[in-house]
């Protein structure tokens, strides 16, 4: 069994997984064909009382990969001009190598064996992340390839709304609609929402469990 002190660590709270909050902005909905244009990654930290908070955020504007599709409707929606030199965009591979380095460093510091993506409507972000990793031939990704924490689902359960802006406002988190659809802004609001839900569950007595079974013999997936 895990005592309360040990339960207040990422490695026990999420079964050895280190939660990493991610948001992407893209030029469409198809991860196979449409460009990844922006990504932000928020790293979290947990204090000795088991309360999690936003630690820091990495942010990259991304150059569309060669041959990428750019849907005009998607660009109009997120307001991104991929040709604007002021974006300071970098190659996908450059961004992901830096993300891998920083995530692995934080994961190791938390004594976790793998990282797990947290995102709002996580299947979308995870799909684009996985495709970018595959497209660039990157190995040893810190991220679980298919498991994730979806804050849309969590917010629907805990707060009663699945839309990020409305869930944040209902939870008392400031949300500026004019800043929305920026990966940097949305990631940090998603991180705040995830932390609030996890911390509230703990405050209500949902964690730690009275008795936690040792699952060391179960699959790591």
Curated annotation (Swiss-Prot):
**Enzyme Commission (EC) number:** 3.1.13.-
Q: Which family does it belong to?
A: Belongs to the RNase T family.
Which sites are catalytic?
181
Cofactor(s) listed: Mg(2+)
For this protein, the record's CDD domains field holds: RNaseT (cd06134)
Naturally occurring in which organism (per UniProt)? Shewanella frigidimarina (strain NCIMB 400)
The terms under GO molecular function for this entry are: 3'-5' exonuclease activity; magnesium ion binding; nucleic acid binding; RNA exonuclease activity, producing 5'-phosphomonoesters
Please tell me where Mg(2+) 1 binds in this chain. Answer: 23
Q: What does the cofactor field's note say? A: Binds two Mg(2+) per subunit. The active form of the enzyme binds two Mg(2+) ions in its active site. The first Mg(2+) forms only one salt bridge with the protein.
Show the GO cellular component annotation of the record.
cytosol
Q: Which InterPro entries match?
A: Exonuclease_RNaseT/DNA_pol3, RNase_T, RNaseH-like_sf, RNaseH_sf
Name which cysteines form disulfide bonds: none
Q: How does it assemble?
A: Homodimer.
- Which GO biological process annotations does it have? DNA replication proofreading; tRNA processing
**In which residues is Mg(2+) 2 bound?**
23, 25, 181, 186
> By what name is this protein known?
Ribonuclease T
Q: Where is this site: Important for substrate binding and specificity?
A: 29, 77, 124, 146
The record places domain Exonuclease at 20-194
Q: Function, please?
A: Trims short 3' overhangs of a variety of RNA species, leaving a one or two nucleotide 3' overhang. Responsible for the end-turnover of tRNA: specifically removes the terminal AMP residue from uncharged tRNA (tRNA-C-C-A). Also appears to be involved in tRNA biosynthesis.
Give UniProt keywords alphabetically.
Answer: Exonuclease, Hydrolase, Magnesium, Metal-binding, Nuclease, tRNA processing
Q: What is the lineage of its organism?
A: Bacteria, Pseudomonadati, Pseudomonadota, Gammaproteobacteria, Alteromonadales
């Amino acid at each position: 069994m895990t005592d309360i002190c040990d339960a207040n660590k990422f490695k026990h709270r999420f079964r050895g997984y280190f939660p990493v909050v991610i948001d992407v902005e893209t030029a469409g909905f198809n991860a196979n064909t449409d460009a990844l244009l922006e990504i932000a990654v928020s790293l979290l930290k947990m204090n000795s009382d088991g309360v999690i908070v936003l630690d820091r955020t990495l942010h990259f504007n991304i150059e569309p990969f060669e041959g990428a599709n750019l849907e005009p409707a998607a660009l109009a929606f997120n307001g991104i001009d991929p040709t604007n030199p002021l974006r300071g965009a970098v190659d996908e591979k450059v961004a992901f190598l830096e993300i891998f380095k920083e995530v692995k460093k934080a994961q190791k510091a938390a004594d976790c064996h793998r990282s797990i993506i947290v995102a709002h409507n996580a299947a979308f972000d995870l799909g684009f992340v996985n495709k970018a990793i595959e497209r660039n031939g990157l190995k040893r990704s810190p991220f679980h390839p298919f498991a994730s924490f979806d804050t849309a689902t969590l917010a629907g359960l805990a707060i009663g709304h699945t839309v990020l802006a409305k869930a944040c406002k209902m939870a008392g988190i400031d949300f500026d609609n004019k800043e929305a659809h920026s990966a940097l802004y949305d990631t940090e609001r998603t991180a705040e929402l995830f932390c609030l839900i996890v911390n509230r569950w703990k405050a209500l007595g949902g964690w730690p469990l009275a008795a936690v079974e040792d699952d060391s013999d179960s699959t790591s997936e």
